[in-house]
């Protein structure tokens, strides 16, 4: 078993995805202070997702990515990030049948 570092805001989604055999290899919640204005999850293999969480794009069949729009201040970023993570978690619950 390979272990990956998981940002705290993504722990719920990553655990649920891996438990449901949607295996992940990399992820980032996005960090204002490091000028990383996106949240993403990379999967081991291409997934045939019918849809993505609200605001996310599917890249190359194996990456879900959200690029932040409100990055002018840390407060705006954190507010948008909270909404993004909530949308992601709702999508994960739907995908894994826990809705």
Describe these PLM feature segments.
Residues 65-99:
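Ampiphathic alpha-helical segments that act as solvent-exposed interaction surfaces
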Residues 53-61:
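Short glycine-aromatic motifs
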Residues 7-54:
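Amphipathic, interaction-prone secondary-structure segments
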Residues 34-46, 62-79:
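Short cationic amphipathic helices and targeting signals
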Residues 22-34, 61-65, 93-99:
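Short glycine-rich, low-complexity/disordered patches
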Residues 1-6:
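Terminal, regulation- and interaction-focused segments at domain boundaries
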């Amino acid at each position: 078993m390979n272990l990956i570092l998981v940002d705290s805001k993504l722990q719920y989604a990553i655990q649920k995805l891996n438990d449901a055999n949607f295996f992940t290899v990399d992820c980032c919640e996005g960090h204002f202070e490091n000028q990383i204005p996106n949240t993403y999850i990379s999967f081991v293999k291409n997934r045939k997702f019918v849809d993505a969480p609200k605001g996310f794009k599917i890249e190359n069949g194996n990456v879900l990515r959200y690029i932040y729009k409100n990055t002018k201040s840390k407060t705006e970023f954190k507010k948008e990030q909270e909404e993004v993570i909530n949308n992601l978690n709702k999508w994960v619950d739907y995908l894994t049948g826990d809705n």
